[in-house]
Amino acid sequence: ELVIFNLISMDRSMFDMNQMFGFLSNLGAINTNNYFAFNENEVEKFRLINALKPGIFQENTQTFAVAIVADLHSSLDPYNTVKQMIEFAVTFSDKFHATLCDQDRTPITKQMISHVESKAQDIARLKQLNKNDTIGA
């Protein structure tokens, strides 16, 4: 179950890559294969990718859109992962004057965020049930 949030420059101006790379580094993101990963206990929670083709970050990259992506089934704590993605998105939006959008690049509403959080809670419950079934087997 992929969760995707897009962050798009309000005026479609290009993000300052040096500033963005420094910002991501300060938040603990790790540059891996030309995208940035946010890890916990050496497991990827979510990643930040270039939302424009070719989808990667390089020194000469120019982009006005980035995407935050997480696979909730791979996450150790799906609900917390979504919360951290939203916190990151708000911080990024404030710093880089970006609009938080859904996977279709439509500005996101509180209702959409609540829906994603509910989906994450459902996945967390299912993971817990499967874990309990495995332990009890």
Map each language-model feature to its residues.
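Long, continuous compositionally biased terminal/linker segments
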Residues: 42-79
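Terminal, regulation- and interaction-focused segments at domain boundaries
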Residues: 1-22
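Well-ordered alpha/beta subsegment
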Residues: 73, 80-84, 92-137
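Short proline/glycine- and acidic-rich turn/helix-capping motifs at secondary-structure junctions
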Residues: 1, 37-45, 102-114
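Short, well-structured beta-strand/strand-turn elements
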Residues: 28-38
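Short amphipathic alpha-helices in soluble, non-transmembrane regions
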Residues: 19-24, 82-90
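Ordered, soluble secondary-structure elements with a strong preference for glycine-centered loop motifs
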Residues: 14-18, 32, 76-83
